[in-house]
Regions:
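A short, charged, Gly/Pro-tolerant segment at domain boundaries
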Residues: 139-157
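Glycine-rich phosphate-binding loops that contact phosphosugars or nucleotide phosphates
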Residues: 4-124, 130-137
Length: 157
């Protein structure tokens, strides 16, 4: 529901979670132009500071407890943006700020950062969100997917 009724969806993450946020953006941009990914944490903070109640922050963070992440989520929360957090920990500082918390990932220690098992769970959540988005917005997503597929197929030799 949040992803469909929005002006912008920012896909954010830091460190290894940024790669997952970029994957989410790459998947959604084929069907929904309102999805954006900002890689730099300073730029993420600025976008959050200008967010509106019509925006959604889709934040990926295994721990849900990093300073940079909270520096993004606090202003977004103050400005009324919806926050969807994808994390491993239900009881984390970020989960306390989120409108929706999606739990995923296998257990990993600090020396296992970015394990394949944890990433597989995150990719599965992205796939479920994307497929549900397309299912609930068929007219828009089918036309956009055809247009983006055409743009990419033109690049094939």
């Amino acid at each position: 529901k949040y992803l469909s009724a929005t002006q912008r969806v920012y896909c954010f993450g830091q460190g290894g979670s940024l790669v997952i946020a970029m994957e989410a953006w790459a998947r959604f941009i084929t069907a929904a132009p309102q999805f954006q990914c900002i890689e730099d944490s300073h730029m993420q903070a600025m976008a959050a500071a200008l967010s509106t109640p019509d925006d959604v922050i889709l934040f990926f963070s295994y721990s849900g407890a990093t300073k940079d992440m909270l520096d993004v989520l606090r202003p977004a929360r103050r400005r009324g943006a919806k926050i969807i957090l994808v994390t491993h920990f239900a009881k984390s500082p970020a989960a306390a700020m989120a409108d929706v918390t999606l739990l995923c990932g296998s257990k990993e220690g600090p020396l296992q950062s970015g394990s394949v098992a944890a990433k597989m769970g995150l990719l599965f959540i992205i796939d479920v969100l994307f497929n549900e988005y397309c299912r609930t917005n068929p007219a828009l997503t089918e036309a956009n997917r055809e247009a983006t597929a055409g743009a990419i197929s033109a690049k094939l030799l």
